[in-house]
Design a protein with these regions (language model features):
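Short glycine-/polar-rich loops that comprise or flank the Walker A/P-loop
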Residues: 2, 153-154, 182-185, 229-230, ...
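Conserved catalytic/switch belt of AAA+ P-loop NTPases
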Residues: 204-207, 216-275, 298
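Conserved RecA-like P-loop NTPase ATPase core
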Residues: 44, 146, 199, 247, ...
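The Walker A (P-loop) glycine that initiates the GxxxxGKT/S ATP-binding motif of P-loop NTPases
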Residues: 160, 201, 237
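AAA+/P-loop NTPase substrate/partner-engagement loops
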Residues: 176-208
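Walker A/P-loop
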Residues: 156-189
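Alpha-helical lid/collar subdomain of P-loop NTPases
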Residues: 1-156, 292, 306-398
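A short helix-turn-beta junction within AAA+ P-loop NTPase domains corresponding to the substrate/partner-engaging
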Residues: 1-2, 184, 252-253, 283-312
Length: 398
């Protein structure tokens, strides 16, 4: 891998290709050994190639603006690593990975991907209708990372627990691109809601007549679109080997979809496949290595922003009382549940928060707030745990 990386860096124009190739390969090897084992992690040659390709683009861009020094080459390569890798790391692995970068590239500094005009458009779209969202720097960073991943790869996966904002990330990015003058068309489908033949199409063995499926029909539509129009085929649902393996040739450098009828559909650089799912346990390593990853963790969720947004929907007369009770009781109760982790039915942090808030909507007295909170947050606990939880909540409410 060192030799491959060295040759690739030389072709991209790096003068210190040998030294940088050793460092970047060491970083990938140590990351594979030291970071947690996650299904969506890929430390192979495809991921390395994506980093080197981004580094080459950044180098060309930097040389167009000023003279590039030896130290600046390392900084550009670190920036390429951050752009391609930080988006897929879990909350706990991120700090470990950044420490590895600091050890392998001592003294070199770098920053995340710069948003520029796109970031300005994202902020404007988030605050305007129909989104009306509270600005969240982590979420904005994920949107910029998704844009970079879509530019790098044909296929991208937005993976994370239910309610973490996966749909919001790509929908806001789409609106921001349109705001910036880029035409974007989207085809959304749930592959798990239909049989394979209805998704990918089938051939009648008697008449030899081909019938398009939902995905193949969308594929025909996007290849007809003008080159200046960005087209996204969004698959919202579980990534299943039954149909995803058929797209492997699309997701690699060939960009070809071969139908069972023998017909081939070739996609241009303006087409992307975007997969939105809660996990990748059924996807093969071959599929994962072909796609860019945007991982949204429960820890990235800002619970106070979520609660503040809900509070704005309440009556003005109750809002000040609710704000005080939320601060004094709700957050303590939520932290207590997170520490317990004894839910009867597995749920996410966002799901737990929304359950609790739904039960205290419209309350006007402290007693009704406490009773509603116990009902909402404690409804997913066993009888004994619910009793202990209720005692704690009543103690905080005194």
């Amino acid at each position: 891998n060192e030799l491959i990386a060295e040759v690739y860096l030389q072709t991209e124009g790096f003068t210190q290709a040998r030294g940088l190739s050793k460092k970047i390969v060491s970083l990938f090897m140590l990351s594979k050994q030291l970071l947690s084992r996650q299904r969506h992690y890929d430390w192979g040659l495809r991921a390395l190639k994506a980093v080197l390709n981004t580094g080459g683009k950044l180098l060309v861009q930097a040389r167009g603006e000023a003279q590039v020094s030896v130290g600046m080459e390392a900084e550009l390569l670190i920036k390429a690593v951050r752009i391609n890798t930080l988006s897929k790391l879990t909350f706990s692995d991120t700090s470990c990975f950044l420490a590895l970068i600091g050890d392998i590239f001592p003294g070199a500094e770098s920053s995340d991907v710069a948003g520029g005009e796109l970031e300005v458009a994202i902020r404007k779209v988030m605050q305007s209708k129909p989104f009306s969202l509270t600005l969240d720097e982590t979420q904005i960073c994920k949107m910029l990372q998704l844009k970079e991943a879509l530019d790098q790869r044909m296929g991208c996966v937005v993976v994370g627990p239910s309610g973490c904002g996966k749909s919001t990330v790509w929908r806001v990015l789409k609106a921001a691109l349109i705001e910036g003058g880029q035409a974007v068309q989207v085809h959304v489908m749930n592959p798990k809601s239909m049989p394979r033949q209805q998704l990918l199409g089938e051939m009648d063995m008697d008449t030899r007549e081909w019938t398009d499926g939902v995905l193949t029909d969308a594929a025909r539509n996007v290849v007809k679109a003008p080159a200046e129009v960005r087209s996204w085929i969004v698959c919202d649902g579980d990534v299943d080997p039954e149909w995803i393996e058929s797209l492997n040739s699309v997701l690699d450098d060939n960009h070809l979809l071969t139908l069972p009828s023998g017909e081939r559909i070739s996609f241009g650089g303006n087409v992307n496949f975007l997969f939105e799912t809660h996990d990748l346990r059924f996807a093969s390593p071959a599929t994962i290595s072909r796609m860019g990853m945007i991982f949204l963790a429960d820890e990235d969720t800002n619970k106070k922003r979520l609660v503040s947004k809900w509070l704005l929907s309440q009556d003005n007369a109750n809002r000040s009382h609710l704000a005080g009770w939320l601060e004094d009781i709700f957050y303590k109760a939520l932290d207590y549940l997170v520490r317990m982790r004894s839910f009867v039915v597995e749920t996410t942090l966002v799901g737990t928060i929304l359950n609790g808030l739904s039960s205290i909507s419209g309350v006007s007295t402290k007693l009704s707030f406490v009773v509603g909170l116990i009902r909402g947050l404690g409804g997913n606990l066993s009888a004994s745990d619910r009793s202990c939880f209720a005692k704690e909540v009543f103690a905080w409410a005194r």
